[in-house]
């Protein structure tokens, strides 16, 4: 069946290009034969370079290449014991709840039971990729490895986008699903690469940007990764010529600019909510009308997005319980749901929307826990903050776009990072210091045969609590007896107990 949209997409039909088959075979072989921690990187490569029109139909079930590779990755991780020791929590429950609501509600509301198989496939795309990240990214060291590998994979894509901008032709159109000739709006080429829309392409790379900026405090190598990653993301955003990725970049910039207010983030959030509440009663059309005023590159559809939010509020009773089959009657052009929060509600009811919000809130809670306990302005502190900035950027993007195709992957990758940090926060809250018992949190250290690794004993001597201060306000020194005289060594700059660099599976000095 052919479905016409912004680009020609093929569903329920096997559509394979020889190069697409080759890419899938290489990705699956790499997933099976290389270290398991690299599995999500190969999924990222498929998402960036292969359109979702490349798919196989097996016994009536649709398998885009990314979905097939995700199943292979899940099997590889499960067989290798990658999920051993994984502690699931609130974020994991909410992500699963959101997927389950859509699997149940769409077939029931539409009256088409056969759609349950389609929704199960979508659930594999979302939950599968989410669990691949949760099984492989278990600490900050894994997160850093992922960000480095993501840059290696994503950087060559800038060449494809620049060629498309220079020629007006998309070289990835040979795979199908994306047009050969680049769309033009207001006289500007809107490059899209392998993605279904230029907006989605820009948002995908903007979502990766915080992971690269988060490396800034790691010396020369970290600054190089941050600089090159920023250039990659900005080049793609420039080629897309869309307001949404530009606005998302502005929000991320504001988020990182607020890093120096990290100790007062709760006050910042409360102030923002109070300001929005006041503006909602002062403004004639409600605070969400502000989105209609945004037009960064010309030809923006901000007013459509305002009307969509307004209509969703006015029709709340229609979709709140189990979603709805159509929003076409909400207003002119409102069948196009360019808001992820509303799309979740339309597909899975208000519970699905709350699950999306709730996962964000719990992620911020876990991030805030570690920000209060890690050495301020250190590289680990900044990396944790960067994950928060990434989620904040997604919150802004979701007001103006709804993800589909391979782009949905980037949200579940991002929230999985939040789930990892929240998991370690729960461990440490229950038993301070327990998050640092193994070389990699939740997994046995290599060669340990399942036995938790033990950290080297501290030097003999009594380390005074951080609260005790020497004259003049300097941190207290630890005193060790040696040679009949009291030797003095500086107290480790560790903050509260259990936060001296071993909090997320990192050895001291990493």
Where are these regions (language model features)?
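Transmembrane alpha-helices of multi-pass inner-membrane enzymes
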Residues: 72, 266-267, 387-398, 402-450
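A conserved mid-to-late transmembrane alpha helix and its immediate loop/hinge
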Residues: 197-199, 234-238, 242-243, 326, ...
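Hydrophobic transmembrane alpha-helices and their immediate junctions
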Residues: 225, 253-258, 350-395
């Amino acid at each position: 069946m052919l479905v016409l949209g912004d680009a020609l997409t093929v569903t329920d039909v096997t559509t394979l290009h020889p190069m697409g088959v080759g890419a899938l075979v290489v990705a699956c072989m790499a997933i099976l034969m290389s270290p398991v921690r690299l599995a999500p990187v190969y999924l990222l490569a498929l998402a960036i370079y292969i359109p979702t029109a490349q798919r196989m139909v097996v016994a009536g079930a649709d398998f885009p290449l990314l979905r097939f590779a995700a199943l292979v990755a899940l099997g590889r991780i499960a067989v290798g014991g990658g999920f051993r020791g994984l502690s699931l929590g609130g974020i994991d429950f909410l992500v699963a709840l959101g997927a389950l609501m859509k699997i149940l509600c769409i077939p029931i509301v539409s009256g088409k039971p056969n759609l349950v198989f389609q929704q199960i496939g979508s659930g594999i795309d979302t939950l599968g990729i989410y669990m691949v990240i949760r099984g492989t990214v278990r600490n900050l060291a894994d997160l850093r490895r992922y960000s480095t590998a993501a840059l290696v994979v994503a950087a060559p894509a800038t060449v494809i986008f620049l060629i498309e901008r220079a020629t007006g032709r998309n070289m990835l159109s040979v795979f199908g699903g994306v047009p050969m000739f680049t769309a033009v709006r207001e006289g500007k080429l809107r490059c899209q690469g392998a993605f279904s829309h230029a907006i989605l392409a820009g948002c995908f790379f903007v979502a990766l940007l915080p992971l690269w900026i988060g490396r800034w405090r790691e010396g020369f190598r970290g600054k190089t990764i941050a600089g090159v990653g920023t250039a990659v993301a900005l080049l793609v955003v420039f080629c897309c010529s869309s307001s949404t990725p530009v606005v998302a970049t502005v929000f991320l910039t504001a988020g990182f600019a607020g890093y120096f207010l990290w100790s007062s983030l709760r006050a910042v959030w409360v102030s923002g909510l109070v300001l929005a509440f006041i503006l909602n009663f002062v403004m004639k059309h409600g605070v969400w009308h502000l989105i209609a005023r945004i037009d960064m590159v010309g030809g923006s559809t901000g007013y459509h997005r305002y009307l969509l939010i307004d209509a969703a509020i006015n029709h709340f009773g229609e979709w709140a319980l189990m979603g709805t089959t159509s929003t076409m009657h909400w207003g002119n052009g409102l069948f196009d749901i360019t808001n992820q929060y509303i799309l979740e509600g339309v597909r899975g009811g208000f519970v699905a929307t709350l699950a999306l919000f709730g996962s964000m809130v719990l992620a911020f809670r876990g991030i805030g826990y570690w920000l209060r306990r890690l050495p301020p302005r250190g590289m680990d502190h900044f990396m944790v903050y960067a994950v928060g900035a990434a989620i904040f950027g997604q919150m802004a993007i979701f007001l103006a776009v709804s993800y589909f195709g391979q782009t949905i992957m980037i949200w579940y990758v991002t929230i999985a990072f939040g789930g990892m940090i929240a998991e370690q926060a729960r461990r440490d809250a229950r038993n301070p210091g327990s998050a640092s018992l193994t070389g990699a949190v939740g997994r046995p250290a290599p060669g340990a045969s399942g036995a938790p690794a033990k950290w080297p004993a501290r030097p003999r001597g009594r380390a005074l609590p951080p609260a005790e201060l020497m004259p003049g306000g300097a941190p207290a020194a630890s005193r060790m007896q040696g040679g009949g005289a009291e030797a003095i060594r500086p107290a480790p700059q560790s903050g509260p107990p259990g936060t001296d660099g071993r909090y997320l599976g990192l050895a001291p000095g990493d």
